[in-house]
């Protein structure tokens, strides 16, 4: 009696092709995933800048339409200062952790006062400007 032997399985070429396809899919998916993380961090910075902007507007209402001076917008003056806090919960820096501070680094803001108005700029990765208020 003869036994018929059937080899079932994948060849080396087939396995290599599958590995190459998985590598190509990973090369496409990983940068897209990292880009989504940056978008989420930028959205956090935008929300934080908006909260600080509202705090500055509240400060101006309480001080005869006078905005705080350049370099004076911080957690110490807008939240922890004497009297009513102008920002209930100071925004966090999504890039470095901790509180958002004035400066050009990622996740921070820059506040500039002109004679009639102010400019508040939020910074993303590498210090790039991602939002300007108002």
Residue ranges and their predicted role:
Residues 40-65:
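Membrane-proximal N-terminal amphipathic helix
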Residues 1-10:
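N-terminal leader/signal peptides at the extreme start of proteins
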Residues 16-32:
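Alpha-helical hydrophobic helix detector
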Residues 57, 61-119:
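Extracellular/periplasmic head regions of type IV pilus-like filament subunits
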């Amino acid at each position: 009696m003869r036994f018929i032997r059937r080899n079932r399985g994948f060849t080396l070429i087939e396995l290599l092709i599958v590995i190459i396809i998985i590598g190509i899919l990973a090369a496409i998916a990983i940068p897209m995933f990292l880009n989504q993380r940056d978008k989420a961090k930028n959205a956090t910075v935008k929300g934080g800048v908006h909260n600080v902007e509202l705090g500055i507007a509240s400060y101006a209402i309480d001080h005869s339409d006078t905005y705080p001076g350049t370099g004076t917008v911080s957690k110490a003056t807008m939240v922890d200062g004497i009297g009513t806090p102008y920002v209930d919960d100071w925004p966090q820096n999504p890039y470095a952790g901790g509180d958002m501070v004035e400066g050009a680094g990622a996740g921070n803001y820059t506040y500039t006062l002109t004679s009639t108005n102010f400019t508040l700029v939020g910074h993303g990765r590498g210090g790039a400007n991602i939002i300007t208020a108002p």
